[in-house]
């Protein structure tokens, strides 16, 4: 019998983030409490999102609106790393970036967790910015998925290519 396997990845669908960004921008332009505050949200580069507003509290409220839209589109908030608000002239800016890929450090933590607490006979291999988990039994793989879902590694994990 051949080994069954799945991949553990940390990826975000850019189109879904773009949709959430446009929804948040539309809400910022139409909501009464954001009128005349200069609140806006936009892409600045491939992976960076910039929020601007006249006051720090309006900036943080705009960030909450964006996070709400991310949640509605089933995007984990761990995938968005928001920076600190910074004042530049009369406006406040906040830049945040999308977190994608599993770092080597996190991959080692995940493999150690699988080795220590997972079922016997399960192998985990680091392949670039993703992780391949394989076993002879599919039940063991499902046990590993539930083990990893119950643990917080600080990144959004997805389980793909289940074979």
From Swiss-Prot:
CDD domains, A to Z: YajQ_like
GO CC list: cytosol
A GO MF term: nucleotide binding
What InterPro entries does the annotation carry?
A: DUF520, UPF0234-like_C, UPF0234_N, YajQ-like_sf
What start and end residues bound the annotated signal peptide? none
This protein's record includes keyword Nucleotide-binding? yes
Which Pfam family, just one, is annotated for this protein? DUF520
Any idea which UniProt keywords this protein has? Nucleotide-binding
Q: Which domain of life is it from?
A: Bacteria
Q: What does this protein do?
A: Nucleotide-binding protein.
Q: Which NCBIfam families match?
A: PRK05412.1 (NF003819)
Q: HAMAP family given for it?
A: YajQ
Family the entry assigns? Belongs to the YajQ family.
The name this protein goes by in its record: Nucleotide-binding protein ROP_16630
